[in-house]
């Protein structure tokens, strides 16, 4: 089985100015391909050190994947150093040169000479088109090694890898097996607990393989199987999926790359249910999240951010008696907030968020104590309590995701 090394080029990575998210993405994709990544390397924009890294990588890896250093500036040196190392010439790629020329011509701007560097490639390489930028990527087989050169910006790198580089890697892997992969997304359970629940499957795994990843307040499980036929590979994945669902299916919210908020929004659109939100400590995060999706104006009618007791009473019309007797961190307050925003905005669903963001306590409640109210036309209003930690922004983000999960659970049941 081929081994790969990912080499990220850029001094900004070493200085901590940019996080190397490219390596994580490529590693996950290669794992699904059955290609093992044994090394991640980060090197600055220094010719001597980059050459040294290339030589080290060639001694231990079959596939060298570079990210970064393909741009027009003096510190973009990746292809120049690799070309010299392989004793290859640099040549101009017509497609990318025309693309750059057209860009500047259409804007009536003069193209500086250094921009042409983005259209320069190593001779004998397969050009990887950059659909979202100008720097050409490259795929090259030389001396029993495969070299893949990708741009640094993730918005350019990811589509280039997915559309052009990865199919080439798969075609040359020599493995004629069919590969099937499925991503499962869980909310409300930690990675350590999920991994513990699946421990016997993970420890004894051969085919399929199971990998767990901690996401943003969620856990991702990836099942990957190989077989001689698509049907057999799919069956292997399905059997493992069913076993995982048997153990932790109550925490599953979806599959693939669809986020929880995107999934819930699609469900609301399909059912033509309108929604509004009243937010206290989340300060509009729920509304900002749901507003990200196209067509949302059909169902999202508006909302209110009522951070203080005064605005909860004056704008959201929460009863002063409820606030005085029960406090703002209470089921009663959460219910009234949800009911009132639904009534004021004339929506089918009203959701509310109130609680203690942290790190300090409030009304005797520890940081991370939250209440989410859910009011649905024709149903009894409910309030749900959750207790998180002391991290303020983590609590706010998690509460918003919890709100989407509560809506999904209601929609699934009704």
Curated annotation (Swiss-Prot):
PANTHER family: NICOTINAMIDE-NUCLEOTIDE AMIDOHYDROLASE PNCC, NMN AMIDOHYDROLASE-LIKE PROTEIN YFAY
One Pfam short name: CinA
Family affiliation: Belongs to the CinA family.
Positions in coiled-coil regions: none
Species: Listeria monocytogenes serotype 4a (strain HCC23)
Name of the protein in its database record: Putative competence-damage inducible protein
SMART domains on file: MoCF_biosynth (SM00852)
Xref: InterPro entries: CinA, CinA-like_C, CinA_C, CinA_KH, Competence-induced_CinA, MoaB/Mog-like_dom_sf, MoaB/Mog_dom
CDD domains cross-referenced by the UniProt entry: cinA
